[in-house]
From Swiss-Prot:
It catalyses: 5-(methylsulfanyl)-D-ribulose 1-phosphate = S-methyl-1-thio-D-xylulose 5-phosphate; 5-(methylsulfanyl)-D-ribulose 1-phosphate = 1-(methylsulfanyl)ribulose 5-phosphate. Its EC number is 5.3.3.23. Pathway: Amino-acid biosynthesis; L-methionine biosynthesis via salvage pathway; Metabolic intermediate biosynthesis; 1-deoxy-D-xylulose 5-phosphate biosynthesis. It comes from the Bacteria. CDD domains: RLP_RrRLP (cd08210). Belongs to the RuBisCO large chain family. Type IV subfamily. Disruption phenotype: Disruption of the gene abolishes the ability to utilize 5'-methylthioadenosine (MTA) as a sole sulfur source. Mutant cannot release methanethiol upon MTA feeding and accumulates MTRu-1P. Inactivation of the gene increases ethylene production from MTA-grown cells. Keywords: Amino-acid biosynthesis, Isomerase, Methionine biosynthesis. This is 5-methylthioribulose-1-phosphate isomerase. GO terms for molecular function: isomerase activity; magnesium ion binding; ribulose-bisphosphate carboxylase activity. One of its GO terms (biological process) is 1-deoxy-D-xylulose 5-phosphate biosynthetic process.
């Protein structure tokens, strides 16, 4: 039998039908045809998925663990997604719950370029404090207005300032003009204050456009970027990460909702595997419906030991406010990037002061958090 990865699914089925359902998933995620039509022993033994375990988790609810051949992956990130959950994602009774990959497969994809420790080093942050981030909004502002927002945020002492994930190469703020203006504003503040604030442009487009955008950023002294893996595609995301080993990448979760991959596996493992140095996800109690347990599981998957890969920093976000900072630090400890966007921008003329209050609140609360990193 060839090397195998393990994939665990949550399946809605009756006790009478679950065994057949599990075997059906094993076939669908491997050879996708009747086994009776296969006459090659190597395919039957080495490629066909194997049902290893079925565990009942409630009425008409089961966990199914499959062993799938790593040979079917071919070293490609998109094909990894395909063989883990491609056709089965079309079955609305099934969720991809977890993955367990052999060390050689982990090493072949490589994970983050610099990881959690590298991000801390970039902004001069010690290991005992959480990091801070905000976003440039709204869509529609011209480059000079976005640069002014970034300047005032940087004066407040933020670690990271990212583009809103919807910013691309629109006519009202073309990528090159926006990045040049914002990078210059942040760099000027850093030189004045001795700070190390990083600006993260949002990357978009096809592979050649992404390459060009990263190079544009590098030309402006930028070394950290925002990217949406499910928009550009897993293979493209992975290719960009590997092509620019000195760059760091925050992965945005947009469009990940329809995938029905459990968030800890999706953001904490798959995004980390393909190269996310930080993973943004919807925090509990915000605009989205994730539970506190789910959010903690995402953070644990992003930070935990995994075959020698760098840890990814969790970035809980989505409608957060300054009032929630103590709670977030108590939940995640210092091993987190706290992202607050619109709530800061509501300060308008007091943006710098409100940003400074955010930074001070995170610094003051971090020492009281429990932390999730091993």
């Amino acid at each position: 039998m060839t090397d195998r990865l393990r994939a665990t699914y949550r399946v809605k089925a009756t006790a009478a039908s679950i065994e057949a359902r599990a075997k059906g998933i094993a076939v669908e995620q491997s050879v996708e045809m009747p086994l009776s039509a296969i006459d090659d022993p190597a395919v039957l033994d080495g490629i066909v998925g194997v049902v290893e375990e079925i565990t009942e988790r409630g009425e008409d609810c089961f966990e199914v663990r499959l062993a799938l051949s790593t040979a079917t992956i071919g070293g490609d990130a998109g094909q990894l997604f395909n063989m883990l959950f491609g056709n089965t994602s079309l079955q609305d009774d099934t969720v991809l719950l977890d993955i367990d990959l052999p060390d050689d497969l982990l090493a072949s994809f490589g994970g983050p370029n610099i990881g959690a420790a590298g991000l801390r080093a970039r902004v001069g942050a010690s290991a005992d404090r959480a990091l801070t981030c905000s976003a440039l909004k709204p869509q529609g502002l011209p480059p000079d207005r976005l640069a002014d927002l970034a300047r005032r945020m940087a004066l407040g002492g933020l670690d990271f300032i990212k583009d809103d994930h919807g910013m691309a190469d629109q006519a009202y703020a073309p990528f090159a003009s926006r990045v040049g203006a914002v990078a210059a504003a942040v760099d000027e503040v850093n030189r004045q204050t001795g700070g190390q604030t990083r600006y993260l442009p949002s990357l978009s487009g096809h592979l050649d456009q992404l390459r060009s955008q990263v190079r544009t950023g590098l030309d402006h002294g930028i070394d950290t970027f925002l990217i949406a893996p499910m928009i550009v595609g897993p293979s493209t995301f992975h290719a960009v990460v590997r092509e620019f080993p000195g760059a760091a990448f925050f992965a945005h979760p947009t469009l990940a909702g329809p995938s029905r991959i459990a968030p800890p596996a999706h953001f904490g493992k798959l995004f980390r595997l393909l190269g996310a140095d930080a993973v943004i996800f919807p925090n509990s109690g915000g605009r989205f419906g994730y539970s506190r347990d789910t959010c903690q599981a995402v953070a644990e998957a992003a930070l935990g030991p995994w075959g020698g890969l760098h840890a990814s920093l969790p970035v809980p976000a989505g409608g957060m406010s300054l009032a929630r900072v103590p709670e977030m630090i108590a939940t995640y400890g210092p091993d987190v990037i706290v992202l607050i966007g619109g709530n800061l921008l509501e300060a308008r003329d007091r943006l710098t002061e409100e940003t400074a209050a955010f930074v001070a609140s995170v610094a003051g609360a971090a020492s009281r958090g429990c932390g999730l990193a091993p």
